[in-house]
Structure formats: structure tokens, C-alpha cells
Design a protein with these regions (language model features):
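Conserved, structured core segments of small domains
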Residues: 1-94
Length: 94
């Protein structure tokens, strides 16, 4: 399953804190680099999202928790859609 993990830094969070925490968690082996399918920052900084693929939602919790003092998370499971198949289905349903 693919998960969107959107983050927004707390107002007092600094770039040094975030970079330090990322390095700390990388050294601890908890950043799930093999399961990350994308890492995107929003223009302007302080927010972005990661795409993580795992069947275990507990892995998402374990990934996000060490960052919760620095940022808020909005985590959602994603359902893939194939455009042409969706349009065909919509035409039948409408």
C-alpha cells in the first residue's frame, strides 16, 4: 500500500533541527529509505510530503513519531487510479 505522509513544520522549527533529526534517524535505520517512493518539499519550505510503500501501517507510525516534536503529520493511504479505466467506469455509473 502507498501512503502519503504530508508534513508541516511547527512555527519554531528550524532547518538545522530538521536536518539533524533526519541524519539521526538515518543513523538509527528508521527512515525507511528502501520503502520511500518519493520525497517532495513544497516551494517556500517548511512543508512537503513523502510517499512510502508498506503493507504495515505500524511502520508509518514508527517512521513519523520521532519527528512529531518538530512537525505535524497528515498521513493517508492512497488508492491508485488508472485514468482511462476510471473514465470508462464513470460513464457507466453516470
Amino acid at each position: 500500500m502507498l501512503w502519503s505522509c504530508a508534513y508541516t513544520w511547527h512555527p519554531t522549527t528550524t532547518v538545522q533541527q530538521v536536518r539533524g533529526r533526519i541524519l539521526q534517524q538515518d543513523e538509527a535505520g528508521t527512515n525507511l529509505p528502501d520503502k520511500m517512493r518519493g520525497w517532495y518539499d513544497l516551494v517556500g519550505g517548511g512543508a512537503g510530503f513523502l510517499l512510502i510503500e508498506t503493507e504495515d501501517p505500524g511502520e508509518i507510525n514508527a517512521f513519523c513519531q520521532p519527528y512529531m516534536d518538530l512537525m505535524d503529520w497528515d498521513v493517508r493511504a492512497l488508492i491508485p487510479q488508472e485514468y482511462r479505466a476510471a473514465i470508462k467506469r464513470f460513464r457507466k455509473e453516470v
